[in-house]
Regions:
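Short acidic, glycine/serine/threonine-rich loops at helix termini
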Residues: 10-15, 113-115, 160-167, 232, ...
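DNA-contacting surface of Y-family translesion DNA polymerases
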Residues: 19-20, 204-348
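Short Gly/Ser/Thr- and Asp/Glu-enriched loop/turn motifs at secondary-structure junctions
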Residues: 101-106, 153-157, 297-301, 348
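Catalytic palm subdomain of template-directed nucleic-acid polymerases
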Residues: 108-138, 212
């Protein structure tokens, strides 16, 4: 949580048990919680505002969980440092060309060229060898960083490895899972929620629903021509993915044309107070500044985009300005707020 000392502190990430106990999404505010983050006491004000129970049994339940909840500040510089350590571990098992960092906490490694070197036993299948080498990588990560890692594996392509990671590996005793083409009908098609599928968000799910598609199995068996006509190349690509087909390659990752560096958030509810919106912008500017300093770069252009709720009859805010090269947090924050103040009137 960023700025936990403030009632408007921003929840940037939450554990599954936190979401289940407190009924919250991954992102929110301290005042969205049914307890005070400082005292860990039940907040009757917040509870009533959200229509929650206030009976003694529920109060005890919330306070008991609040006492054992760890609230920690975001440390992007630390995350980047540990990420670099893990990338170094990957290079013990594959060349830099075989490694593709996907995000701050995920990455792909193609073990095709090194698999038989690390696991030379000829009697073992490729699937068994991949599992053994993945276990070695997990152990190395734990010994060097103290982090328990989860591994999605595939004999086929990066897509199935990612789906195995998101939908099975996190639930297995070994924290590993291997999905191949043979698993598509049984595992890929049975993914319970469409939004649990790589590349499908709430908006895309709604568009699929209007076409009568309500599951990954429905998508896999839909007419690809109709999907392309209604949703463009994105619809066709997801149809291929639903059938386990992925032509992406770790050795030739997508290289964006833009050299920009940014941060984005989809807020869990409407924000009406200008002060709350400014807090979000400040925190995002701070994270971008940290990342700029980490890679030794400076910004020369600052831009912001803010979208309104669907029921607000207002155009989104899109604006930018040229600045003197800087990676200073205070300066970048001031530029962001200046752009915001120049365009914002009111709304959520």
């Amino acid at each position: 949580m960023s700025r936990a000392d403030n009632s408007a502190g921003l929840i940037l990430a939450s554990s599954p048990i936190f979401k289940k106990v407190f009924g919250k999404s991954n992102v929110g505010r301290a005042y969205d919680l049914p307890f005070d983050v400082q005292t860990r006491k039940f907040s009757y004000y917040n509870a009533k505002k959200q229509g929650l129970r206030t009976d003694p049994e529920y109060v005890r339940f919330i306070e008991d969980w609040a006492k054992v909840t760890f609230i920690v500040p975001p440390r992007m510089d630390k995350y980047i440092s540990v990420n670099m350590e893990i990338q170094g571990i990957f290079q013990n098992y594959g060349s830099p060309n075989d490694i593709y960092p996907y995000s701050i906490d995920e990455g792909f490694i193609d073990l095709s060229s090194s698999l038989n070197y690390f696991v030379p036993e000829k009697q073992l299948s490729r699937k068994q060898k991949l599992d053994l080498i993945s276990a070695k990588i997990q152990r190395d990560i734990w010994r060097q960083t103290g982090i328990y890692s989860t591994v999605g594996i595939s004999n086929a392509n990066p897509l199935l490895a990612k789906l195995a990671l998101d939908n099975e590996a996190k639930k297995t005793p070994t924290m590993r899972a291997n999905w191949s083409y043979e698993d598509v009908e049984q595992k890929v098609w049975s993914i319970p929620n469409m939004t649990d599928f790589w590349g499908i968000g709430k908006r895309m799910e709604k568009r699929f629903n209007t076409l009568g598609i309500h599951s990954i199995k429905d998508l896999a068996n839909a007419n690809p021509d109709i999907l392309k006509k209604e949703l463009g190349v994105a619809g066709l690509r997801l149809w291929f993915h639903a059938n386990g087909i992925d032509e992406s390659n770790v050795h030739k990752p997508y290289k964006p044309k833009s050299k920009g560096l940014g941060n984005s958030q989809v807020l869990p509810r409407d924000y009406f107070r200008q002060r709350d919106i400014e807090i979000v912008l400040r925190e995002m500017a701070e994270q971008v500044a940290i990342r700029l300093r980490k890679i030794g770069k400076k910004a020369t252009v600052v831009s912001i985009h803010l979208g309104y709720s669907n029921h607000e009859n207002k155009r989104s805010i899109n604006t930018q300005m040229k600045i003197e090269p800087t990676n200073n947090t205070d300066l970048l924050t001031n530029y962001v707020l200046k752009l915001f103040h120049n365009k914002y009137t009111s709304g959520a």
